[in-house]
A protein has these predicted regions:
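Active-site gating loops and adjacent loop-to-helix segments of metal-dependent hydrolytic enzymes
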Residues: 91-114, 208-219, 284-287
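Histidine-rich, glycine-flanked metal-binding segment
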Residues: 32, 36-75
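His/Asp/Glu-enriched, well-ordered alpha-helical/loop segment
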Residues: 90-91, 95-101, 105-107, 238, ...
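Sec-dependent N-terminal signal peptides
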Residues: 5-14
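Glycine-enriched alpha-helix->loop->beta-strand junction motifs that scaffold or abut catalytic
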Residues: 256-263, 280-286, 314-316
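C-terminal cap of metal-dependent C-N hydrolases
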Residues: 30-33, 369-412
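Polyanionic/metal-chelating signatures
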Residues: 126-263, 388
């Protein structure tokens, strides 16, 4: 009898253990904005081992774990395309910055400096940002510096894609004449396009190329720099160039067509003046919908209606913010864009699938079968800043929404009725 009772207890404990460790989950009764279609639909999502395996609009799929969204909006996890998450903690404190290089220029990669325990990561994750593209600060070269993609799950076993984009700048933000900057970019791209597989076959071969090139010698190219330039021309590496003036955008379009660049323009405050040219040449844009007041003579055509104008023209849009740390404010920018005429579904795409497609993040950015389950359940409208995530799943894992701010709040309100001396 005792043996039978022990056996029953063992079976119960084992079954409970399996249930707790089960890796399949269904999110039911959700209003789904999938990042693909403009409109939402009611449905249920089945997740197995971190992957979306079924989406049903009728019956609820079976799973060991069930989360009832109760009609709330769910979206793909938002992807911030322009951040310094994990490499800058306090901008004014140099010892917390890993975004600048003193030796390398074009080939400078920030990937290995990423800190998954940055206190800024939980803060942005708790506001719906599940992944980010982290970019270095511009080097002394007009193009140069490599950004990487990171999941914001705070795991020491970092999930990332290294060196997925190069950055650059052109226009009034530079320290020299834009004519000289454009000529230098052209010369660098011409040098890169002259490289072949034989030149890149060994470090010794690359050293010979550097010695034989007056440009490479003058700019003190290193091995990493030449390899990065070769990838830019021959590996379809995205090139993000920050510029604003309409005439500068036209010049960059000419360079794109000359060298077959995978060009992305960031800033682009005068993009609405050349919307047709941007769309015709298939150039994605990273813009700040809130930034509608000219900050320089390069931005005189800035206006609050830019995003709906560009969307109507057919441009691929992504959003960034001018403030560091609070990268989650891209959803506030999306809300401003919608308030001024952009479609709601288009704004969700700008926060999710447009980023994934632009940077070749093939299994992220949308809620569809086969994609990783980066999903946010919102308590209300995700484009309303006062609305917060109720649940954030990254790779199907229900992540912790505790932040340093919430811990401080809880610490100091816990014993409010006690005199200050006796508070913990």
């Amino acid at each position: 009898m005792i043996k039978n009772k022990l056996l029953v207890v063992l079976i119960i404990l084992t079954s409970n253990s399996v249930l707790l460790e089960s890796s399949n989950l269904v999110i039911k009764n959700a209003e789904i904005y999938d990042g693909i279609e403009n409109n939402s639909y009611q449905g249920h999502i089945l997740i197995n081992d971190g992957v979306i395996t079924k989406i049903s609009k009728t019956s609820v799929p079976y799973a060991d774990k069930v989360y009832d969204a109760k009609g709330k909006i769910i979206t793909p996890g938002f992807i911030a395309p322009d951040t310094q998450l994990g490499i800058v903690e306090i901008g004014a404190l140099n010892v917390t910055r890993d975004d600048e290089a003193s030796i390398y220029n074009i080939g400078f990669s920030i990937h290995d400096a990423f800190n998954p325990n940055s206190v800024l990561i939980p803060w942005n994750r708790a506001n719906g940002i599940t992944s980010a593209i982290t970019l270095p600060r511009n080097t002394s070269s007009p193009i140069g510096g490599l950004g990487s993609f990171f999941l914001l799950d705070s795991n020491l076993d970092i999930s990332s894609e290294a060196d997925i984009a190069m950055i650059g700048r052109f226009g009034g933000s530079g320290s020299s004449s834009r004519a000289e900057t454009l000529a230098l970019i052209d010369d660098m791209l011409s040098f890169a396009s002259s490289l072949d597989k034989k030149d890149m076959s060994s470090d010794a071969s690359i050293d010979e190329v550097i010695d034989d090139s007056s440009l490479a010698s003058h700019m003190d190219f290193k091995l990493r720099d030449v390899k990065a330039l070769y990838r830019l021309i021959n590996g379809n590496l995205p090139l993000i160039i920050k510029t604003h003036r309409a005439s500068d955008i036209i010049k960059l379009i000419e360079l794109k067509n000359t060298y077959n660049l995978n060009l992305i323009i960031m800033g682009a405050q005068e993009a609405s003046l050349v919307a047709d040219e941007i769309v015709e040449n298939n150039i994605p844009l990273i813009v700040n919908p809130i930034n509608n007041i000219p900050n320089s003579f390069d931005e005189l055509a800035s206006n609050i209606n830019m995003t709906p104008i560009l969307e109507k023209a057919g441009a691929t849009l992504m959003f960034n913010v001018s403030r560091s740390h609070n990268y989650h404010l891209i959803r506030q920018g999306a809300g401003v864009a919608v308030a001024n005429g952009m479609s709601y579904g288009g704004a969700i795409k700008a926060l999710t699938s447009n980023v994934a497609k632009t940077f070749n993040l093939n299994d992220r950015g949308s809620i569809k079968v086969g994609n990783m389950a980066d999903i946010v359940v919102w308590e209300a409208d995700p484009l309303e800043p006062s609305s917060m995530p109720e649940k954030v799943f990254i790779n199907g894992v229900d992540t912790d929404l505790t932040t340093r701010s919430t811990r401080l709040r809880d610490r100091y309100i816990r014993d409010l009725e006690k005199p200050n001396t006796y508070r913990n």
